[in-house]
Amino acid sequence: MVIQRKYRASRRLGVSLWGRSKDPFNTRNYPPGQHGNMGYKKPSDFGKQFGAHKKFKFYYAISSKQMRNMFLKAYKKKGDTGDNFVGLLESMLSSVLYNSGLVPTIFSARQLISHKHVLVNGKVVNISSYSVKPGDTIKLREKAVNLPSVLAAIDAQEQKVPDYLEVDVKERSVKYLRVPKYYEVPYPANMEVNLVIEFYSR
């Protein structure tokens, strides 16, 4: 199953990245390919930085190139680089949709977007990395509101909706209120943005 293969990232990194009950890490908290729980090797400083980079990359389901471009953009902006970086990541259309709890995974969010099932202020947007602005309203199109994955996500309520989003479950919509700071994002895992900054600053 595609989602299960993607969840292998949790086992590779030694954390439950998305905090989901179906995450294989919950029952097999050791690296994939390893027979039995022999634990994880203690990483070097570079290993810690690289691991932090990987956690963000997999959590948001983006490429290394996208990650680097976002970091460079965050670095050039005024203010705290870590907050800027996370703010850009959380402003992606796929992130807002996933954090709304209207979809079960970041992967399903990206799929709905690419299949043109998502509206931003009434217009179809099919780019997952589209930057949502404060005040924008994201809504599922009519043909997607009762998809099994959407109904299952709403029923499960596994996603903690952050304060910077306003969700209307009945309307299958979410309003992006503001760009969050790093500390405001309810990551299920320990996401060390300082190590990502160190990784890109080498």
UniProtKB/Swiss-Prot annotation:
Look up the signal peptide feature and give its range.
none
* Domain S4 RNA-binding positions: 91-154
Query: At the top level of its lineage, which domain of life is listed?
Result: Bacteria
Q: Which PROSITE patterns match?
A: S4
GO CC, one annotated term: small ribosomal subunit
Q: Which InterPro entries match?
A: Ribosomal_uS4, Ribosomal_uS4_bac-type, Ribosomal_uS4_N, S4_RNA-bd, S4_RNA-bd_sf
User: Which protein is depicted?
Assistant: Small ribosomal subunit protein uS4
Query: What gene is this protein translated from?
Result: rpsD
